[in-house]
Regions:
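Disordered, acidic Ser/Thr/Pro-rich linker "stalks" and the adjacent N-terminal cap
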Residues: 411-412, 545-548, 588, 656-692, ...
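Aromatic- and acidic-residue-enriched segments that line the glycan-binding/catalytic groove
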Residues: 102-110, 121, 131-157, 207-211, ...
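Catalytic-core region of carbohydrate-active enzymes that cleave or remodel glycosidic bonds
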Residues: 217, 250-344, 348-351, 355, ...
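Aromatic-lined substrate-binding rim segments of carbohydrate-active enzymes
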Residues: 73-139, 211-219
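Short beta-strand-plus-loop segments that form exposed binding edges in beta-rich domains
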Residues: 484-490, 620-627, 699-706
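Aromatic-lined ligand-binding clefts that engage carbohydrates, nucleic acids, or primary amines
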Residues: 439-453, 482, 565-588, 595-596, ...
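N-terminal carbohydrate-binding accessory modules
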Residues: 26-87, 117
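Active-site neighborhood of glycoside hydrolase catalytic domains
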Residues: 162-238
């Protein structure tokens, strides 16, 4: 009996010692990230990553150094450590480092090497994603605007000029980061090749050339990987690279890795972007995702030994003009990149943070379960600055918009921003009109926000967000002056539309009916005035003496406003701009970002590290003009207040087609209705004969589960050649039910994002009707349908009909 007890005691002691040894080993391995002089290894093993030869689960926090003021970098890194993360994941943004061709900047807030050194100082490894394309809801996906000065350039392809510039950029990044790879004693354990290329195209030779470029810079020993979605990763997967998946909270994780497991059963699994929330766009509600779904997904992955990078762990702010835009259509992103992440925009812990931290205590530093014990995570650091408020104050100094001019071209025809060697800001286009004694319609493709004036009087606007391309003009006399103020917003960062020129990108056609004949004029001579959106231009404008420019180019209220506020103590604050129109804000010389009264973002985050005791300066460039030029600082952000001219819903009664006498398309299976299968993944439904029409109407008769709200993640149509039709021209025509509070509107079925979805309102039962305008008459041979990505594919449609007209 005593022998058995002694044996049990010895076994228990051995287990405890082994557990202790494992914990010590994990701690030692993690701490080794801070030992810059010790070379290490990071490789793939049998179903696991190997750090210095030992199994290792990557628990990465995605953070972006340009979205965080440099004085706050270390605090944000410590916040990630306090969540139990062992790695930081970051993009390298080409266009912030090479804003003008050949001029590289890796200093100050662009010092990516210093950010990596701070990670190592705080016992964290680093995964680097150097593009060249990064997406990230960032201007042009990180590609520099000046590439578009070569109008025929083929972006993200083996275009000779594009690849030449890519290799120069990657070499410059390598000079900064190669000394910091794990083989050289640094924290960098992996480098990503390109980014989600399967969502862009299929071009293994291009992806291979990017791989070869990076391998030549960093050496054969450093682990290279590529990320994509489970639906498209095979398109460009290279045999000698590690493959990782990107998906969002709530996704069916086994389903996401199913195909990878079939192809590479012994490979480690990693979700390289596990989306904690989502990004916001102007004119739509603030995006949120449930904490419980995020935490449950991460817990499931850790329990199965699956590595991850939480995108975003801390989103930060797209300061200045760096916020991008989504596509199809044009959906510009707001300045805040809060992302509903566990660490909010201003670096504080959210309820998500605490729920996640509690779960992460179950796992050790290397990502392995502690067997029911609760581990000890690093302490949550104190915020570097307090939150302060600022009393309301008025911006009293004013100069009209045109005083910001830095270049005038008086000859020639229309030119885009890029043809004017102009990256960001606004342009004024001017021309003289012919005699048109009746009302006329002006048609033009303008990127992005245009305001029209005749002899200085405002006559209307077009907004690319709303796909507006026409405006009605009043009768005019010969010689009347037409002015068009065009503001360029963030360039598209996702999909084929990243080749996003700014300004007037087509002819301007003015059409009128006179004596029963339609007559069209296309003005050929245009004045072109550049108005940059940088701080120095704003200061010059406000200091310029008044002259006769005001007479011709001073649309009422549009221009530069300056004011001052005094602080007794410094801290972070949120300046409120809900009484303003649209434009840019500068505080003490720092470009804080875009504002737009439509919301949902009404405040800008102002870091205390960029403020000072005493007098602080603020300049607002408002291209529309404020209702009242006042600002105040509040203690919390306002990220979910819309001020729209009309609802985002697409349910105008006049847009609903009458299908009572219409004949639905016949499917290849026979009959005028089809039945979708339950479960996740793409499904294709072919028509018995090609269908023709400009509009497609989908009538959903039932869902897989009674009582479910109906939902669709993505739709594609196949053309006569069996290939997917471009969705760039598509617009929403009608939906009988949409949940706009959660941004589950009709446009989500063609937004190129498999994790977002259209969904009906809670009380709405089938049948439902969706109508999409394809932009032109199309021949359609099949419909592709993707249900929601969550377990069980909630809201999946079952029986449905399709009409084209």
């Amino acid at each position: 009996m005593k022998t058995k007890r002694l044996t049990k005691l010895l076994m228990a002691s051995a287990i405890a010692l082994a557990s202790s040894a494992t914990t010590v080993q994990a701690a030692t391995t993690a701490v080794s990230a801070s030992k810059a002089s010790v070379a290490g290894t990071f490789t793939t093993g049998d179903k696991t990553f190997l750090l210095n030869g030992q199994p290792f689960v990557v628990k990465a926090a995605e953070v972006h150094y340009p979205r965080i003021p440099r004085p706050y970098w270390e605090h944000r890194i410590k916040m990630c450590r306090a969540l139990g993360m062992n790695t930081l994941c970051l993009y390298v943004f080409w266009n912030i480092h090479e804003q003008q061709e050949g001029q590289f900047d890796f200093t100050g807030n662009n010092n990516v090497a210093e950010f990596c050194r701070l990670a190592q100082k705080n016992d964290m490894y680093v995964i680097v994603r150097p593009g060249p394309y990064v997406c990230a809801e960032w201007e042009m996906g990180g590609l520099p605007w000046w590439l578009l000065k070569k109008k025929d350039i083929r972006l993200r392809e083996r275009d000779s000029y594009f690849m030449e510039r890519v290799k120069i950029f990657e070499q410059k990044v390598g000079e900064q980061l190669k000394p910091l790879t794990i083989q050289n004693g640094g924290p960098i354990i992996m480098i990503q090749v390109e980014n989600e290329y399967g969502s862009y195209g299929e071009d293994k030779p291009y992806v291979s050339e990017i791989r070869d470029c990076l391998r030549g810079i960093y050496g054969k020993e450093l682990e290279l990987f590529q990320c994509d979605w489970s639906s498209n990763f095979e398109k460009n997967g290279l045999d000698d690279l590690t493959w990782t998946m990107n998906f969002g909270t709530g996704a069916n994780i086994d389903q996401q890795f199913r195909r990878l497991g079939e192809l590479r059963p012994n490979a480690p699994k990693m979700c390289s972007e596990f989306w904690s929330g989502w990004f916001d766009k102007w004119g739509a509600r603030h995006e949120t995702r449930p904490a419980k779904d995020m935490v449950a997904g991460m817990d499931e992955m850790l329990s199965k030994g699956i590595s991850f990078s939480l995108y975003m762990t801390h989103g930060g702010t797209s300061f200045g003009h760096w916020a991008g835009a989504n596509s199809p259509g044009f959906a510009p992103d707001v300045t805040s990149y809060d992302y509903d992440a566990p660490i909010n925009e201003y670096g504080q812990a959210t309820p998500k943070f605490w729920e996640l931290r509690t779960m992460m205590e179950k796992y050790d530093a290397n990502g392995f379960a502690l067997g029911g014990r609760k581990g000890s995570l690093p302490a949550v650091p104190k915020a570097p600055m307090p939150i302060i408020t600022v009393p309301k104050f008025e911006l009293k100094d004013f100069k009209p918009f045109v005083y910001g001019c830095d270049s005038i071209a008086k000859e020639g025809g229309l030119k885009t921003f890029e043809e004017m060697d102009f990256g960001w800001g606004s342009m004024i286009y001017g021309t003289e009109l012919p005699e048109i004694p009746t009302r006329s319609v002006l048609t033009a493709d303008i990127h992005d926000f245009a305001q029209f004036f005749i002899n200085g009087k405002y006559v209307g606007k077009t907004d690319r967000v709303k796909n507006e391309k026409t405006i009605t003009l009043p009768p005019v006399r010969r010689g009347d002056k037409l002015l068009i103020i065009v503001e360029g917003m963030g360039r598209i960062n996702f999909g084929r539309a990243i080749k996003d020129f700014k300004g007037i990108v087509s002819d301007v056609a003015i059409t009128a009916v006179m004596d029963n004949h339609e007559i069209t004029w296309k003005p050929q001579l245009w004045l072109k005035i550049r108005i940059p959106d940088d701080y120095n231009s704003a200061v010059r404008a406000l200091a310029a003496p008044a002259d006769d420019r005001e007479k011709d180019f001073a649309p009422n209220g549009r221009g530069y406003y300056r004011g001052y506020f005094t602080l007794k103590k410094v801290g972070d604050t949120f300046l409120n701009f809900e009484t303003w129109g649209k434009g840019q804000v500068y505080v003490n010389g720092h470009a804080m970002g875009r504002i737009w009264s439509i919301g949902p973002q009404q405040t800008l985050y102002i870091p205390g590290c960029w403020l000072k005791k005493g007098k602080n300066e603020i300049i607002v460039l408002d291209v529309v003009g404020p209702r009242e030029p006042v600002v105040w600082g509040q203690a919390t952000p306002e990220l979910n207040k819309l001020q729209l001219e009309k609802s985002n819903k697409h349910n105008a009664p006049g847009d609903r087609p009458d299908l009572n006498s219409a004949t639905p398309a016949t499917f290849s299976t026979g009959g005028g209705s089809a039945t979708a299968k339950p479960g996740n993944g793409w499904q294709t439904f072919r028509f018995q004969a090609p269908q023709k029409g400009r509009h497609i109407a989908i009538e959903i008769l039932s869902t897989q589960k009674d009582g479910d709200r109906t939902a669709i993640a993505e739709l594609y149509l196949q053309g006569a050649d069996g290939k997917r039709l471009s969705r760039e021209p598509w617009t929403c025509k009608y939906a009988d039910s949409e949940e706009d509070n959660g941004n589950h509107t009709l446009d989500k079925v063609f937004d190129l994002q498999e994790s977002t979805y259209w969904q009906t309102e809670k009380s709405a039962a089938p049948p439902h009707l969706l109508v999409i305008d394809l932009g032109a008459v199309q021949t359609v041979t099949a419909l592709e349908y993707l249900p929601r990505a969550e377990q069980g594919a909630p809201g999946s449609m079952k029986n449905f009909k399709v009409y084209m007209y």
